């Protein structure tokens, strides 16, 4: 199980993705903008950031870079098509394009969480 910080500006999409990640077994903290997400970082450790490319009060890519400097693994979601070079410049991989398959999201989050060393065997 990973401690996931989810930053998604659309309230319904945020709740949906948070529910999915919780069903996958992760401990999810959800927020809708950069300010709230930054505040959540001060509360406790986060293993994985899952953020939309564009948030209400800033760019998810900028917040993503901030998290990377803190050693937090990141996953960026986007409803826009990006060229590979543009996506890599704007945010570290992986980039998951919306709409996505639930299994694909689970695979990416699990892989990033494992790389962060936060997963553990099911009891």
Language-model features, listed with the residues they occupy:
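Conserved acidic carboxylate
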Residues: 8
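Acidic phosphotransfer microenvironment of two-component signaling modules
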Residues: 11, 32-36, 103
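Two-component/phosphorelay signaling modules centered on CheY-like receiver
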Residues: 11-29
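Acidic, metal-coordinating helix/loop segments flanking the phosphotransfer/catalytic sites
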Residues: 30-48
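Conserved phosphotransfer microenvironments
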Residues: 51-68
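Hydrophobic/aromatic residues positioned on beta-strands within the core alpha/beta folds
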Residues: 75-79
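As written
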Residues: 88-96
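C-terminal output helix
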Residues: 100-117, 121-122
